[in-house]
Swiss-Prot record:
Record region (Domain III): 157-205
InterPro entries in alphabetical order: DNA_helicase_Holl-junc_RuvA_I (IPR013849), Hlx-hairpin-Hlx_DNA-bd_motif (IPR003583), NA-bd_OB-fold (IPR012340), RuvA (IPR000085), RuvA_2-like (IPR010994), RuvA_C (IPR011114), RuvA_C_sf (IPR036267)
Protein name: Holliday junction branch migration complex subunit RuvA
Primary site of residence: cytoplasm
Name of the gene this protein is made from: ruvA
UniProt lineage: Bacteria, Pseudomonadati, Pseudomonadota, Gammaproteobacteria, Alteromonadales
Family matches, as Pfam families: HHH_5 (PF14520), RuvA_C (PF07499), RuvA_N (PF01330)
Length: 205
């Protein structure tokens, strides 16, 4: 298993990099939280990796810290969360922000991430709670500090109609920011989910 790579960063195009190590080029996919911590092109970089072997491909996922990799490995053990969604989650929030979401049972923030529906968010909260507790208990002081570091702000409380409308727009491929903006602009007190979805869609056409 490939657990760590150190080499020259020869290509950077989010979320993928090409790292040259001893004459070999390794294609590595990274969460944006790690990607933006990388040095400039042609500089030396060290990353911690997770190696996935599938029938049709061999994939490397890279992280700046061992702690972020450890969290990724816990995420992909959650039912319904594969490497792609795990990468998306860690691109949308830091490790510390994710830990804070789980500690506060914050479904509203999790469902704003692309690909994370209400059921997946609920599974994450249930399945990750004990796993994170165990990870934090076994982490050294600096590692624990990293995992808890965040600029976490709970998502504002919204009513069911707004949640349903945002979820519907996300399922159609709109970005979280676009969906939230359109729903907020279209919302009127007493609107049903169906009417709010229709009004939000009209404003985006």
């Amino acid at each position: 298993m490939i657990g760590r790579l150190r080499g020259v960063l020869v290509e950077k195009q989010a979320p993928e990099i090409l790292l040259e190590v001893a004459g070999l080029g390794y294609e590595v996919q990274m969460p944006l939280t790690s990607f933006y911590e990388l040095p400039d092109l042609n500089q030396e970089a060290q990353i911690y990796t997770h190696f996935v072997v599938r029938e049709d491909a061999q994939l490397l996922y890279g992280f700046i810290t061992k702690q972020e990799r450890a969290l990724f490995r816990l995420l992909i053990k959650t039912n319904g969360v594969g490497p792609k969604l795990g990468l998306t989650i860690l691109s949308g929030m830091t490790a510390g922000e994710f830990v804070a979401c789980v500690e506060r049972d914050d479904i509203a923030t999790l469902v704003k991430l692309p690909g994370v529906g209400k059921k997946t968010a609920e599974r994450l909260l249930v399945e990750m709670r004990d796993k994170l507790k165990s990870l934090l208990e076994t982490s050294a002081g600096s590692e624990r500090e990293f995992m808890l570091k965040s600029n976490y702000t709970p998502a504002p409380v919204v009513n069911t109609a707004e949640e349903d409308a945002i979820a519907a727009l996300l399922s159609l491929g709109y970005k979280p920011a676009q969906a939230s903006k359109a729903v907020s602009a279209a919302f009127k007190e007493g609107m049903s989910s169906e009417d709010l979805i229709k009004s939000s869609l009209k404003s985006m056409l």
